[in-house]
Amino acid sequence: MMHSIKCDVAIIGAGPAGLAAAIAARKEGAKRVLVVERDNKLGGIFQQCIHPGFGLTYFHEELTGPEYAGRFIDEMREHDVDTLLNSMVLEISPDGGMIVADRKSVV
């Protein structure tokens, strides 16, 4: 089954950089931002970094990796960023379209 999703900005990967990019895109005026993540949760490698030491510069407090990712995930949700989990980008076309596959369909 094929679906069409329109967005102003599509970000591939919901690791730290992807989450920050999604938030920045919304703050800069992008109306619809979509993050495509191949895993079943947001946060990327930070979900595995259970030791403290993150967040000192940005949040001014010491956080574990999952706590740090959680702050960005919360902020991303506050800015109404859309996500596709368990999905992989298969192709990006010159006109800005992309083909994304999840476990059930191709978008």
Briefly describe each language-model feature range:
Residues 1-8, 103-105:
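A short, basic/flexible loop-to-alpha-helix module at the beginning of a structural domain
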Residues 7-71, 75:
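Beta1-alpha1 glycine-rich phosphate/pyrophosphate-binding loop at the start
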Residues 17, 28, 64-105:
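Feature captures the FAD/FMN-dependent oxidoreductase FAD-binding
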